[in-house]
Amino acid sequence: MNFTVGFKPLLGDAHSMDNLEKQLICPICLEMFSKPVVILPCQHNLCRKCANDVFQASNPLWQSRGSTTVSSGGRFRCPSCRHEVVLDRHGVYGLQRNLLVENIIDIYKQESSRPLHSKAEQHLMCEEHEEEKINIYCLSCEVPTCSLCKVFGAHKDCEVAPLPTIYKRQKSELSDGIAMLVAGNDRVQAVITQMEEVCQTIEDNSRRQKQLLNQRFESLCAVLEERKGELLQALAREQEEKLQRVRGLIRQYGDHLEASSKLVETAIQSMEEPQMALYLQQAKELINKVGAMSKVELAGRPEPGYESMEQFTVSVEHVAEMLRTIDFQPGASGEEEEVAPDGDEGSAGQEEERPDGP
C-alpha cells in the first residue's frame, strides 16, 4: 500500500491540516519536528536536538567539555508526561528514531505546499472600524489594532509595528520562558528526589542507632532503663524535627513544581492558538507570569551531613565493665545495696556526657 495515498484523506482540507500540524509540534522548540525525530520510552516524540538540549539542562555535569554533545549515559524527564527517560552509553543518540513521524512530516510538507482553495484565513475585526481587519500592533498601548486606528483613531500618535513581527517576537519570548521552566522543573524534581533520599537516610540512621542503643542497654541492669528511655526520646525528637523540616521543604518544592507545571500547560495551550491577534491579547500576561515564576527563589536545602544521627551514639563499654565489678559486700545492709546502683547510674551518666573520658 502506498503510504502517501492512504494518508491523503487526512489532509483533504485546511481544518485537517491544522489539526495534523498541532500533532507535529515539538513540545520544546514549539516548531514542527526537525529530523531526526526520536521516540521516548513513554511514546512521546522530540527532535533529537531538543532532546539533547533538555538532557544537558538536566545533567550539566554530563556535558563534554568544549562540546555541545553528550557522550554517554544519564537521564532526563519527558517534557510532556514527566516520565523519567534513562539513557544508555550512547546518550540521546541511543534513542530510536520515529521514521513514521518523519514520513508524516514529509507528506505534510508536500501537501501544505499545494494551494488549498477552501482555506480562508479568519481575521479579528476592529471594534472601532468594523470593516477593518486587525493587522498592526500598537507598541505604546501594547494592543493589536487596525490601520485606520493608527491613521485617524485612538492610536494615531502611537508607535506601531506589523502584527506578524510582534507575534513572532512574543511567541519566541514565551517559547524561551517555557524551555527555562521545563529545565527548572527537572532541577526541582531532582532536588525533591534528593531530599526524599535524605528522609530515608535519616530514618535508616535513626533505626540503626535505636538498634545499637537497645543492644547496649540490654547488657545493663534495670537501673539504666530510665536513662535508656531518655536517650531514645531525645533521638526520636531530633528525628522528628529533622523529618518535619525536610518534609516541609519537600512540600514547598512540590507546591512550586505543581504551580510551575500548570503554568507551563497553560502557556503551551496558548501557543497552540492559531489567531495572532487573539494570541497576543493574552501573551503578555503569560510572559510576565512565566518570567516571574522563573525568578522565584526557593528555600535552601538541608546542609551537608544534616541527615547524620551520629551525635546520638552512646558508648557503654566502660559502664558495663564498671557494673561487672559490683559484687556482694559482706556486712552491707540491704538499703546500701539498693543505693549503690543509683550511684553507679550517676557515674554512668557523667561518663556519657564526657566523650573523652576513659
Swiss-Prot record:
Binding partners and assembly = Homooligomer and heterooligomer. Interacts with TRIM63 and probably with TRIM55. Interacts with tubulin.
Give the binding site residues for Zn(2+). C126, H129, C149, H155
- Compartment list: Cytoplasm, Cytoskeleton; Cytoplasm, Myofibril, Sarcomere, Z line
Q: Where is this region: Disordered?
A: 326-358
Q: Extract the SUPFAM superfamilies matched here.
A: B-box zinc-binding domain, RING/U-box
Report the coiled-coil segments.
194-258
What SMART domains has UniProt attached to this entry? BBOX, RING
Keywords for this entry?
A: Coiled coil, Cytoplasm, Cytoskeleton, Developmental protein, Differentiation, Metal-binding, Microtubule, Zinc, Zinc-finger
What PANTHER family does its record include? E3 UBIQUITIN-PROTEIN LIGASE TRIM
- Does the keyword Acyltransferase belong to this entry? no
Q: Where are the zinc fingers (RING-type)?
A: 26-82
Q: What is its main location?
A: cytoplasm
Q: Which InterPro entries match?
A: COS_domain, TRIM/RBCC, Trim54_Bbox2_Zfn, TRIM54_RING-HC, Znf-RING_euk, Znf_B-box, Znf_RING, Znf_RING/FYVE/PHD
Q: What function is annotated for this protein?
A: May bind and stabilize microtubules during myotubes formation.
Quote the Pfam families the UniProt record gives.
zf-B_box, zf-RING_UBOX
GO MF annotation, one: zinc ion binding
One Gene Ontology cellular component: microtubule
Which protein, by its recorded name, is this?
A: Tripartite motif-containing protein 54
Q: Does the keyword Zinc-finger apply?
A: yes
Q: Which organism is it from?
A: Pongo abelii (Sumatran orangutan)
Which cysteine residues pair off into disulfide bonds?
Answer: none
